[in-house]
């Protein structure tokens, strides 16, 4: 059967919050089958831990943030993206501040942490959410959509009127039966424009942002001396964010996701629209690995002895 996955051991890292600028210690712990993805603020007294769910996303202006019973955790999308990319079903995430550390602005450091901790299979069937019919959310010319598809495929288009972005690819399609999350998506960094950074800082935000954890652009060019990691890093980062936003469902998706000029808010609204329509989705498990979509048959991160053939 296709099994659930967790960490072999706990692991910690320290970084800064992108918006708060605060020093943050993040600890990732193994969790029992069917636990799901659970956050806990250890700096708050008597704070109950909470499981990620779309309705707990309360802020999507600059990042994806969860809030439950007064405990808020912001900038979850890169960590959530890494968990999705490595197929982690069950994990406890502890933080001593209100924001996941930004690290280098991508999901790469979180992928490294998860791989260092080790990934193990558990004696429980992995549960998927399968898209049964098209679900769409629109605002003006922006839109996001789920379609039925036996696998996991994403199509994302951005439209930035900036010379440094326009000459890179502004559309990308990835089918995870054929493409590697780690190699092709995970290292794409968040990006921002200098005039926006200055405005955010005047409001007490982006205090932890720097050229070490973001691509920064002025009116004409990329300011980072090392340039881009991918030719199409801008749109790849938007896809990285979307993968993390969608994993707030708590289960991997079997279906196709398409987006045009979308962000955290629209991604979350699409999840809410999906869950509100009971005819649009169903849970799925696979007793035989060969019956599962190719995107999920040979999960990344397992020891070679556990890789499926």
Swiss-Prot record:
EC main group: hydrolase
Residues given in the record as Zn(2+) binding sites: 78, 237, 241
Keywords assigned: Hydrolase, Lipid A biosynthesis, Lipid biosynthesis, Lipid metabolism, Metal-binding, Zinc
Gene3D superfamilies: lpxc deacetylase, domain 1, lpxc deacetylase, domain 2
EC numbers on record: 3.5.1.108
Superkingdom of the source species: Bacteria
The reaction(s) this protein catalyses: a UDP-3-O-[(3R)-3-hydroxyacyl]-N-acetyl-alpha-D-glucosamine + H2O = a UDP-3-O-[(3R)-3-hydroxyacyl]-alpha-D-glucosamine + acetate
Pfam families in the record: LpxC
Gene Ontology molecular functions: metal ion binding; UDP-3-O-acyl-N-acetylglucosamine deacetylase activity
Positions in coiled-coil regions: none
Catalytic residues identified in the record: 264
GO cellular component: membrane
GO biological process, one term: lipid A biosynthetic process
Pathway info: Glycolipid biosynthesis; lipid IV(A) biosynthesis; lipid IV(A) from (3R)-3-hydroxytetradecanoyl-[acyl-carrier-protein] and UDP-N-acetyl-alpha-D-glucosamine: step 2/6
Cofactor(s) the protein requires to work: Zn(2+)
Purpose of the protein: Catalyzes the hydrolysis of UDP-3-O-myristoyl-N-acetylglucosamine to form UDP-3-O-myristoylglucosamine and acetate, the committed step in lipid A biosynthesis.
HAMAP family (alphabetical): LpxC (MF_00388)
Protein family membership: Belongs to the LpxC family.
Name of protein: UDP-3-O-acyl-N-acetylglucosamine deacetylase
């Amino acid at each position: 059967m296709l099994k659930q996955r967790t960490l072999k051991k706990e692991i910690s890292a320290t970084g800064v919050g992108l918006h708060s600028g605060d020093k943050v210690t993040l600890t990732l712990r193994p969790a029992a089958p069917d636990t799901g993805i659970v956050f806990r603020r250890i700096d708050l007294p008597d704070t109950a831990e909470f499981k990620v769910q779309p309705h707990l996303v309360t802020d999507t202006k600059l990042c994806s943030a969860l809030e439950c019973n007064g405990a808020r955790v912001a900038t979850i999308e890169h960590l959530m993206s890494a968990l999705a990319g490595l197929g982690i079903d069950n994990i406890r995430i502890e933080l001593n501040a209100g924001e996941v550390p930004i690290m280098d602005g991508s999901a790469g450091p979180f992928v490294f942490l998860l791989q260092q901790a080790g990934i193990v299979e558990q004696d429980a069937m992995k549960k998927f959410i399968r898209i049964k019919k098209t679900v769409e959310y629109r605002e003006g010319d922006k839109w996001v959509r789920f379609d039925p598809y036996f696998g996991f495929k994403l199509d994302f288009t951005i439209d930035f009127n900036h010379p440094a972005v326009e000459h890179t690819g502004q559309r990308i399609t990835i089918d995870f039966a054929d493409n590697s999350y780690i190699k092709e998506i995970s290292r794409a960094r968040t990006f921002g424009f200098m005039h926006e950074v200055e405005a955010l800082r005047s409001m007490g935000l982006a205090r932890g942002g720097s050229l070490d954890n973001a691509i920064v652009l002025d009116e004409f060019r990329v300011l980072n001396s090392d340039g881009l990691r991918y030719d199409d890093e801008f749109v790849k980062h938007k896809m990285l964010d979307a993968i993390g936003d969608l994993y707030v469902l708590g289960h991997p998706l079997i279906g196709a996701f398409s987006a045009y000029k979308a962000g955290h808010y629209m991604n979350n609204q699409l999840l809410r629209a999906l869950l509100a329509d009971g005819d649009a989705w169903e849970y799925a498990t696979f007793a035989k690995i060969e019956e599962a979509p190719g995107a999920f048959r040979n999960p990344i991160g397992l020891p070679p002895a556990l890789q499926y053939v």
